[in-house]
Amino acid sequence: MKLSNQKTGHLLHSLDVSYGSGSGQQAVIGSTSQDSAESMWVVRSEGCKQGDAIEKNQLIRLQHARTGKWLHSHLFQSPLSGQQEVSCFGSSEQSDTGDVWEIEWDDGKKAAWMQDMAIRLKHKDTGRYLSNHGKMYPRPIAGNSEVFASSAKGKEQLFKATEGVYYSVNK
């Protein structure tokens, strides 16, 4: 699936480029390109089978579909805003608690995560929220915006699942 930020409209995106500072891990950015496979993510959760609903406050991991690395955060500073860096790290065989996110939403009537529903992803280790703003990178990833983790809970922290492969919910 693809995740779009509610404020910027940019897609959560990663490509095989490493940060030049901080962790040096694979960069995660906000992309304006709507048709790239680099914006595809697979949702994983402990004990969750294909077709199981993702419930409010459930712990999930997002795996980058092309590289197999996990959406990750840690205490390194992000390159543009100095907030908390978000990267891609590990592999299907290598994961740690820095890859775990808690899914939240404000609509109390919804029991399960649905397409086009505004959600927040809270990093389990640090309590910060996946975020995107309009600050754009220079070369080599010019035209893409910074993705980071923040303690704020505004529009920069709201994402929605847009296109992707969705399954009927298991009964």
Kindly label every feature range from the protein language model.
Residues 1-171:
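Lectin-like carbohydrate-binding module/patch detector with strong preference for beta-trefoil
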